[in-house]
Each structure stands twice: as structure tokens, then as C-alpha cells.
Amino acid sequence: MSTNVRIFSWFTLSLHRYYKRFMIMNAWKKLIPDMVAVVMFAVISFVYFCPAVPEGRILSQHDSVAGIGAGQEHSEYHKRTGKVTRWTNSIFGGMPTYQMAPSYDSANCLNGIANLYHLYLPTYVWYVFAMLLGFYILLRAFNFKVWMSALGAIIWAFSSYFFIIIAAGHIWKLMTLAYIPPTIAGMVLVYRGKYLLGGLLTALFSALQISSNHIQMSYYFLFVMFFMAIAYGVQAFRENAMASFFKRTGVLALACLLGVCINLSNLYHT
């Protein structure tokens, strides 16, 4: 009897292991089209800036050049002392540097996450890649097929306005705009009951968005979130599902609060 029990236990355990492996392999197979799309975005972004990026050319961006000039004293002080100064004498006879390329220890972790999200692509290349990937995530959250999402992302990313602000050097605005679509994706997923994935996306991209330091764009985006929440609330009211609506709204509020708290040092001085 004990031998039969051991054989049965071994068989059950083996079956369970093979089932887990099958499920993992199946999950990876489902992700293959999305991974192909991401690689395609990286290739498209790189090809668009060829041969300029491989040859090391630098785009003369007015705002970026002005920013470098304004922060020259700040940079030299940091190189000389290793400390970060919060004051400069080079603008308006002296002013705080809180919003001149702000850097705070509490938000430094986001730099590594952002680089990973951009696949460590070169400057200029990752600008377009971030626009492509962000809108792709949004369309996938709306359950569009892979090819439709990829096409929509390309149409979005290659809007003329984005290249105008790249040329002008409005990089903080571009970064913020790149992180808004995936933040909306997180919101959509939460209201569809995918609390963990949606909450993580909302927290991550709201943090990255605020860290991009273009509060004006983030402020405008708050209105989008507000009206989307109203729309989901009306839908929940019609379906007598207000309890679920408040629960999901609470998850979103916590996710957004986390994104804000990570950037609190910067926001405090804004």
C-alpha cells in the first residue's frame, strides 16, 4: 500500500511540474509577438536617426543649449566639490537651482528604471522608442491586436509635433508625453479588475512622468484621469457595481500617491 502511495505521489508531483512548465512556456509564447513588436520599435527608432547617431552627430537644440549654459556654474561646482548646490549666480543675478535639471536621492532609483525601459538606447533614439512603446502599451491595454497596436504606436510616435519639440530641445515635455499613455493603460487595467498589473503600471509611469519634470503636462493629464474616472463611475452606477468602482479607484489613488511620494523632494520645491 505504501509503495502504491509513493508511486501515486511521484506521478502527481511530476504531472504538476510538467503542467507548470507547460504553462510557463505557453505564457512566453503568448509574449513573443509583443517582444517582436518591441524589437521592431527599437530598430525603427535607430534607423530613423541613421547615420547621424552612429556617426556621433549632435542635434543643436536651442533649449538644451540654453539649459547647459544656465547650469554651467552648477556643473563646475559639482565637479570641483562633489556637492550639489541649490543656488546659482548666473541667472537673474542669483536664483535657486531647484528646477534646473533637478536631482534628488529619493528619485535617483527612477533613472535606472527609465534606462531599462528605454533599453539603454542612445540619445535621440530612445526619444522615439519611448513614444512608440508607451502608446503600444496603451493600445494593448484596450485589447487591440498586436499588429493594430504596433501600427497605432507608429502613427502616434511619428506625429510631426514630437519631432518639432525634439529639435527645439523640449525634452522634459517629450518625456512626460511619452509616459502619459502607459499611465492611462494602468488606469484602464485597474478599472477592468487587473489590480496588480494596472496598479504597478500606474505607479511606475506616474512616477516617471513626474520625474520628467514638466509639471504643466502632468497637470493637464490630471484632467484626463478625472474625466475617465467619472466615465467609469457612470458605467459602474448603471451596472450597480459602485462597490467595485470605489475599490478600483482606491487602488488607483494609492498607485498615484506612490508615484507622487517618490518625487516629493522635487515637488516640494516646485
Regions found by a protein language model. Give the residues of each.
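Membrane-interface starts of transmembrane alpha-helices
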Residues: 32-36, 115-123, 144-152, 198
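Transmembrane signal-anchor hairpin modules in multi-pass inner-membrane enzymes, especially those
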Residues: 9, 17-27, 31, 60-66, ...
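Alpha-helix initiation and N-capping motif
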Residues: 40, 71-72, 84, 103-106, ...
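Membrane-embedded helix bundles of polyisoprenyl
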Residues: 132-141, 147-236, 248-270
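Short helix-coil transition/hinge motifs at the ends and kinks of transmembrane helices
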Residues: 238-242
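Membrane-interface coil-to-helix junctions
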Residues: 45-138, 142, 154-181, 213
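Start-transfer (signal-anchor) and selected internal transmembrane alpha helices
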Residues: 3-50, 243, 247-252, 256
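Transmembrane signal-anchor helices characteristic of membrane glycosylation enzymes that use polyprenol
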Residues: 33-70, 255-269
